[in-house]
């Protein structure tokens, strides 16, 4: 065990980056992620981290800087929130297409309008199909640990893909919690120095990202598809190795809570699921068979694991902390993903969506209680009268 400190999610991520011994960091301020860069700037200034700290003139520039640095063989880090995430959209696909294991922390924030700076998953979910590994931490400890795990997976020669290490703005980024900061020797055992054999080298000139003939594109896209498809195996290995070295065991895909004999569960990702667990625990004490399944890996989506582990429940409520206008079922991205994964099971598993927590609002105990009551009603009657509910307006 390392040193346990009471720190925020932002500071925890910064310690993860320090322990990863990154070479290049590029920053641009936007709350709530800014605290990560503030702490990293202090670490560099105080000599705790030997890294090149670059200030971008915007998020597009941030991603462009780490794109080039990674292509030159550096281990790199950047981050953003909200509209900053979408401003850099042009650069995400080139980074994954060039198979550069850039890591980007996203401390979620709602998009404009109305200019709300509260937490939502909408910003990060906009980027979900760019060929990056993506998942959410629900505590400061998990935010630090995911930083290390994602570098390990993304830099594996079987993968070579960038990663969005997501954490809920404010609910994780700013709230303090106990964090075991690992010893550097342990981290070096888990995360060896980055070695990419295909880097820019003036002694061996090459070109990156050129214009090509249309017929040359599909094979490259297929290679990227195969790389994303292969992430799960490497992620499983990394989580096993992490548990061996650090003593903290993470399921690669799902954090299940009180699900062994549950009849209904709430499925979602991020910090609000910790509140869902508290409500499930209370209802269990009253004799109700309820549980929670928190998704740890959003991309690549663990379809087979979802089928295997969640098809046994009578009803599943899906919490989407995002605004997805015009989407199928009037819910969110997670509801669509889950329904697609469980399509083969037809009406055996009833699903219903809950859109809540928009704009950084707290999803309260009472709201989760109402969700569980709706799920119990669906399990009993076998009828889904409405495919999705916006909380608190419709339930």
UniProtKB/Swiss-Prot annotation:
> Which reaction equations make up its catalytic activity?
oxidized 2[4Fe-4S]-[ferredoxin] + oxalate = reduced 2[4Fe-4S]-[ferredoxin] + 2 CO2
- InterPro entries (alphabetical): OxalOxredalpha (IPR054917), PFOR_II (IPR033412), Pyruvate:ferred/Flavod_OxRd (IPR050722), Pyrv_Fd/Flavodoxin_OxRdtase_N (IPR002880), THDP-binding (IPR029061), Transketo_C/PFOR_II (IPR009014)
Signal sequence residues? none
> Among the record's GO biological process terms, what is one?
response to oxidative stress
Q: List residues traversing the bilayer.
A: none
Q: How does activity depend on pH?
A: Optimum pH is 8.7.
EC class name: oxidoreductase
Swiss-Prot/TrEMBL keywords? Oxidoreductase
User: Gene3D superfamilies from the entry?
Assistant: 3.40.50.920, 3.40.50.970
Under the heading CDD domains, the entry gives: TPP_PYR_PFOR_IOR-alpha_like (cd07034)
The superkingdom of the source organism is Bacteria
Q: Does the keyword Acetylation apply?
A: no
Per the UniProt record, which EC number(s) apply here? 1.2.7.10
Named from the GO MF annotations, one term is: oxidoreductase activity, acting on the aldehyde or oxo group of donors, iron-sulfur protein as acceptor
Quaternary state and interactors: Dimer of heterotrimer of one alpha, one beta and one delta subunit.
Q: What does this protein do?
A: Catalyzes the anaerobic oxidation of oxalate using a broad range of electron acceptors, including ferredoxin and the nickel-dependent carbon monoxide dehydrogenase. Does not require coenzyme A as cosubstrate. Enables anaerobic growth on oxalate which is used as energy source by the bacteria.
Q: What is this protein called?
A: Oxalate oxidoreductase subunit alpha
Q: What organism, scientifically named, is this protein from?
A: Moorella thermoacetica (strain ATCC 39073 / JCM 9320)
